[in-house]
Amino acid sequence: LLPILSHHLKAGEIEAARHSQNKAVEYGALLSIPATVALIVLAYPIIDILFRHGRFTAEDSVMTARAVIAYSVGLPSYVMVKALAPNFFARGDTKTPVKYSIVVMIANLSLSIALMIPFGHVGVASATSVASFVSLYQYLRGLKKRGYWSYSAELNRKILKITLCSLVMGGVIYLGELGITWKFDNWLLLSYGIKIPLFAGLCILGVATFCVMAKLTGVLCLTDILKMLSSRGKKNAQKQA
């Protein structure tokens, strides 16, 4: 995004720069929001399959999964900040992001200390997520205040649609987990030969549900995806030439 924004701004193409920023935020939301919901719903089976063996017990899996859920909540804001920060760098403003980072560091440290006592390791993870939203708020406010960029009503609608699709996907995955629990009683007692296919099935079910919902709500447009892929292909061909 940084070289694209720099090119548009140097050429005086303000609207093109705004459009590129909108697309970056939209694609960031399209990737991060569904991933957040999936990580929250599938945290327990993911940790159980990857790590529960040897001295890593079932209780350790549960505790780790809780931390993963707490971290996952902040994933969209992490991604959005990465999409918004280049807007400052493209204008030669490197001081503002540093100031924002200092504020976030202080907020993260303060919240970690405050939440660690009542909630333990989950409190520390939650503090990191909350601090990421503080960072996102700073960037949104700073960009709007300087007139660099502000999200449009259309972008807001798309993000709401993505959130809706993600929640439906999460609900379907959760129902699938309930079905597995009803059928097999206890996930922790299953062998890996059964767990892995069931987990893969839940993932496929989630992806299929999101794609169907995204198509119905107009979130995914095949022509836009093809244009993006073709433009990347042309750029790669030019670099190789």
Residue ranges and their predicted role:
Residues S20, E26-V41, P118-G147, T163:
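Short alpha-helical transmembrane segments in multi-pass integral membrane proteins
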Residues V73-V103, I113-A114, P118:
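Membrane-interface junctions at transmembrane-helix termini in multi-pass inner-membrane proteins
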Residues L1-E15, Q21, A85:
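Helix-loop junctions and terminal segments of transmembrane helices
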Residues I40-G74, Y148, D185-L190:
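Interfacial segments at transmembrane-helix termini and the short loops linking adjacent helices
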Residues S129-I180, A208-C221:
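C-terminal transmembrane helix end/exit motif
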Residues S150-Y151, L175-A241:
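Membrane-proximal transmembrane or re-entrant/amphipathic helices at the cytosolic face
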Residues L30, A70-V73, K99-A107, V130, ...:
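Hydrophobic residues within alpha-helical transmembrane segments
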Residues K95, V104-Y137, L178-I204:
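Membrane-interface helix-loop junctions in multi-pass transport and translocation proteins
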